[in-house]
């Protein structure tokens, strides 16, 4: 998995940062998922090496404009490009469907591909899976914000052990489609009548990786529980520690709240995003100060910037 930040500002865009959007690339299946879609997100796609045609799922955290105003235009552009024959699944708060229907109806916009909207509230309240397929699961939880806001956890299922090609050759197993079956751990009967157990040719199962996307929220236990043991936590950091009172009033997080969440959850790496536009040139407090505050609590912390990409592994690497 690879995460690419398309927008890292809170509230409004700045010259350097667009509003919230994070793309999750799944290269093994030529697929991409999007988390939040602030205004201008489709422009950010054009400035990146991401392929919008691979978009398959969109997860919206909450209905504030800096997280959702870009969605109608992006979906309309997908339709005009004719590149979404497989359809798009949307996940989000209860009002998401009525919001989209209203915008599309009043603008006479026709979506010419399958579009399904899934409400996430029940999965969050009941602690059940929001999504599952052969490779991934997605869970969500309700955060503490002024409107219903949800964090998402994407978990890759365990991966099959590495296939021992040399051993397969020693057993005179002919290469071809049968190798794919054996790699999946299946038992295969060869043309010569031998029955080969694929698990005997594979190493130990490898753990998958996990990503948690957590915004908007003030410090809360629900975020800690959802993020527990994750490889990568993407957490909002709207304010510096010195503005904690404002953070509580507006129900946003400070840099130190994000770091405390990461530390208590025992995650592998923390990335700060959703920075207030006040931290620009001329302000005595800078984004670097927020990063330093967080690293004092949780050293393995990065500061997101637009178009930063991170390969999600048990030990994350950024580029």
Curated annotation (Swiss-Prot):
Zn(2+) 2 binds at residues 66-67, 216, 274. The active site is at 66 (proton acceptor). Binds 2 Zn(2+) ions. Keywords: Endonuclease, Hydrolase, Metal-binding, Nuclease, tRNA processing, Zinc. It holds the Pfam family Lactamase_B. CDD domains: RNaseZ_ZiPD-like_MBL-fold (cd07717). Zn(2+) 1 binds at residues 62, 64, 145, 216. Its EC number is 3.1.26.11. It catalyses: Endonucleolytic cleavage of RNA, removing extra 3' nucleotides from tRNA precursor, generating 3' termini of tRNAs. A 3'-hydroxy group is left at the tRNA terminus and a 5'-phosphoryl group is left at the trailer molecule. Its cofactor is Zn(2+). One of its GO terms (molecular function) is 3'-tRNA processing endoribonuclease activity. HAMAP family: RNase_Z_BN. Homodimer. Zinc phosphodiesterase, which displays some tRNA 3'-processing endonuclease activity. Probably involved in tRNA maturation, by removing a 3'-trailer from precursor tRNA. Belongs to the RNase Z family. NCBIfam families: PRK00055.1-3, RNase_Z. This is Ribonuclease Z. It comes from Synechococcus sp. (strain CC9605). The lineage of its organism: Bacteria, Bacillati, Cyanobacteriota, Cyanophyceae, Synechococcales.
